[in-house]
Amino acid sequence: MDSIKISLEKAENDLFIQSKWWGNPDLPEKFDVPDDLTFICQIRCDEIAEYDVENLLPHKGMLYFFAAIDYYFGNFDSYCPSNLYWDNDDIKVFYVEDIENQTFEQVVFVDDDCKEVALKEMKMVFSKADSMCDGNKMLGEPYNREWDDWDEPYKGWVELLQVDSDDYDDCTLNFIDWGMLHILINRNDLKNKDFSNVTSCICST
């Protein structure tokens, strides 16, 4: 299974209802937003369709990724998931199939002082890559997993998104000694576009 590599670039234009990494999510009006999780990215599925050679992913609509990763930005007073495989409350993936015929709004996250907390949004550029591609990606094999498959009951689950540790202009994301966060989904759930039951696991060498 090939990977879809995700390269990040400085955003030169407004990325409203476009694929973007960090920033604030653009969601349908009155969407139930998990404000206790960090927004990672939103991905327009029509931008990844040509690289999804096995037709595993949706090819229209938008995918949204949220996770309890504030701790890994160095905010050590924040909640940190303790299980090897995270509970569903700690990782959320949402799929909105129709992005053409409804009204969207940007949800801005703020702290107790009403200061915006989102990281600077970045443009996402997609390309085809080999299965073991490192960095940020979708699909393929986990780059730094040191065993053959995920443990039961997650054996055979698909890598929906791999999030790499990195130094950004305004912060550092470090998953336990420069590891990676792997967001996983059951293959049948992915086929049925059901993203309600996902998990994630941090691997670090």
Region annotations inferred by a language model:
Residues 1-205:
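Preference for intrinsically disordered or flexible, low-complexity segments
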